[in-house]
């Protein structure tokens, strides 16, 4: 068994943060680390070592394509999560998401990501598409995500937005969706963050299906 530092930048004074998570010593598969012809700007960073077979900037011009390979219980377990740091006193961003090729159990969206996180995403369940908001907190060492709201949609293109407010230690994140990129609807509860320098992250995972 190996130990990997994955919470080294979570400086939280309110409680002790576990510095190590266990992971299996899984050999790297052929091609995982090979250059795939795509070049990201230096402002981007991966949450884990990426699998270069599963992302691309060249397969579809003007788009970042993310694929899944393993079933994950939470976003924290996913390898190809890519992000930028937030900045204060306020910041926000939105993404346009093409969900036409998503499969049963897939979840793709936009997260305010740190030790405690939340995200707005499209989820495929029972053949239907839903916009969902999901929170995660590991208080009392209970590690699980819980859904706070869902809205069924039929569209294959949606816009997802996260706004962050750090003024006067407010530290809140707000989640929105749009079907046309102009008219926005707030979804889910406001997320109370516990860390200033979290990430705005693009996520794509496959959850266990019933």
Predicted regions and their residues:
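Short carbohydrate-recognition loop motifs
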Residues: 57-75, 130-135
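Extracellular glycan-recognition surfaces and repeat-rich motifs
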Residues: 40-67
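Carbohydrate-binding surfaces in secreted/extracellular proteins
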Residues: 35, 95, 159-189
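Secretory/extracellular carbohydrate-interaction modules
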Residues: 72-128
């Amino acid at each position: 068994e190996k130990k990997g530092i994955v919470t080294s930048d979570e400086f939280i004074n309110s409680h002790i943060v576990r510095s190590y998570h266990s992971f299996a010593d899984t050999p790297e598969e052929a091609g995982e680390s090979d250059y795939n012809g795509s070049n990201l700007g230096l402002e981007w960073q991966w949450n884990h070592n990426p699998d270069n077979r599963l992302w691309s900037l060249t397969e579809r011009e003007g788009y970042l394509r993310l694929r899944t390979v393993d079933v994950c219980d939470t976003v924290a377990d996913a390898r190809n999560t890519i992000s930028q740091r937030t900045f204060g006193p306020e910041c926000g961003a939105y993404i346009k998401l093409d969900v036409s090729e998503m499969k049963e159990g897939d979840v793709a969206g936009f997260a305010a990501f740190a030790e405690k996180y939340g995200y707005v995403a499209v989820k495929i369940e029972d053949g239907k598409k839903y916009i969902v908001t999901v929170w995660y907190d590991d208080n009392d060492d209970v590690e699980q995500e819980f859904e706070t709201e869902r809205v069924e949609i039929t569209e294959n293109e949606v816009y997802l937005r996260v706004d962050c407010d750090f003024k006067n230690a407010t530290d809140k994140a707000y989640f929105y969706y749009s079907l046309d990129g102009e008219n926005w609807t707030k979804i889910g509860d406001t997320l109370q963050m516990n860390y200033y320098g979290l990430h705005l992250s693009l996520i794509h995972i496959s959850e266990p299906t019933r």
